[in-house]
Amino acid sequence: MLVRFACCATLAGALLMPQGARAEGCAAQISKLMSKDTEKLTTRYNRITRQIQERGSSPRLVAEECRIARALTPRLQGQLTAIKESGCIKDPQMGNMIADIVRGHEDDLAMALKTTARSECR
C-alpha cells in the first residue's frame, strides 16, 4: 500500500511539474515581451483620446493623438506578433490571461490604425 501511494505521488508530481514550470516560463516570457514604454504610450493615447471626446478636438490634441498613434502602431504590432509566436496562449494555466492581453492589444492597434488613417494625421 505504501509503495503504491509513493508511486502515485511520484507520477502525480511528474505530471504536474512540467505544466507549472511551463506556466512560470510563459509568465517570464510574457513579462519580457510586455514593454513598459508601449504601455505608457497606450495610456497617453487613451488619455488624449478621452480629452478629445470630453473637450472637443483642438489642433494640438489631434496632432498629439496622431503622433502617439504613429509611434504606438509598430510597437503593438511587434508585441502581438511576439506574443502569438511564443505559444504561451496554448498553455492551460496562462492561456486565458494571454488571450485577454492579445485582445486588448488588438483593440488598441485597431484604434491606432484608425487614427493614423484619418486625413488629419497624414
What are the residue ranges of the model-derived segments?
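Bacterial N-terminal signal peptides
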Residues: 6-14
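Immediate post-signal-peptide N-terminus of mature secreted/exported proteins
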Residues: 21-64, 117-122
